[in-house]
Amino acid sequence: MNRIKIIFLFIFCMAFSNGLGAQQGSSKLAVAKSNLWLTYSGVKGPGEGRHVVLIAADQEYRSEQSIPMLAKVLSRHHGFDCTVLFSVNEKGEVDPTMPAPFKDKTKRHNIPGLKHLAKADCVIWLSRFMHLPEEQMQHFYDYFDSGKPLIALRTANHGFWGGLQYKKGGKNISLREMLGGTFMGHHGGWHREATRGVVVSDNKKHPILIGVEDIWGTSDVYRCHNDKNPFPKDCMSLILGQPLINLEKDAPPNTEKEPLPVAWTKKWTGNKGLESKVFHFTMGSAVDFENEGVRRMTVNAVYWGLGMEKEIKPDSSVAIIGDYKPLKAGFNYEKLGVKPRKVDYYK
């Protein structure tokens, strides 16, 4: 009899242990693997149990390379579960060569897996002139109402063709209003003048800037504001971008061009009255992300957006994992080596 009791006790303990393990692991990546997106399970770290969805959907700045690299950094060095979504062609290939917008006004782009935005704790987003079907756009609109953080890189401020059909209080909301600025032209020479980041001294203690030193990239400075649309009062500028005279890292500044805001924070409140933290960084080409400062700011922004500022360490690793040989930005695809590739190519 005692032996039977011991056996039942053992079975009960095992069942309880497994149930507890399942509970503790319930926050693990709840996104099914697919040949249309990438998934990275986080290791043990501050981000354990948090899910970051990253979107790569542009045609110029090689986000199909930089975004998976960021996902590896976040998952392997910081413990975040990550899902990477891409714009794909009719064959299911990542295809930066597709026109944006299409000449055929009936055609639409496709970003499979946007339903996973509903499971995201944070979104990192880089798209350019995506013309998506309304059911895919709805996933964005729902996220904009979620109160969760949004990190918008480079061309995200003109990320959708024709603007948003997102409304708040019966009013159409623009990306300018949501992100705090939108592309109004190339202040720096397009593909000719690199950018040197200059920390705004009044805001140098902001958590996103912890451990950030050198900031440089080959993408030019965007003009996102003018006299009619000045830098918003509800935004906090963190970095000014100084155009350089060429694309070399040690190039002197172009003194004929003033530095303009390239990184700022703000808050956004959607239709549910929930407040989101927003970080907009108008640098962000794949080559820019070779720079440690650019990577660290983006990683720090995830922590900041999630209210995890105390977990930001100035010496935490943002080292690139594996080979990272980003192609240059531009539209001369054959010369640059850009072509449609299977999703797994970017794993």
Regions of interest found by a model, annotated:
Residues 116, 125, 129-211:
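A glycine-rich, often tryptophan-bearing local segment used as a flexible ligand/cofactor-contacting loop or short
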Residues 29-37, 75, 81, 108, ...:
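Catalytic beta-strand/loop cores that center a nucleophilic Ser/Cys/Thr
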Residues 7-19:
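Bacterial N-terminal signal peptides
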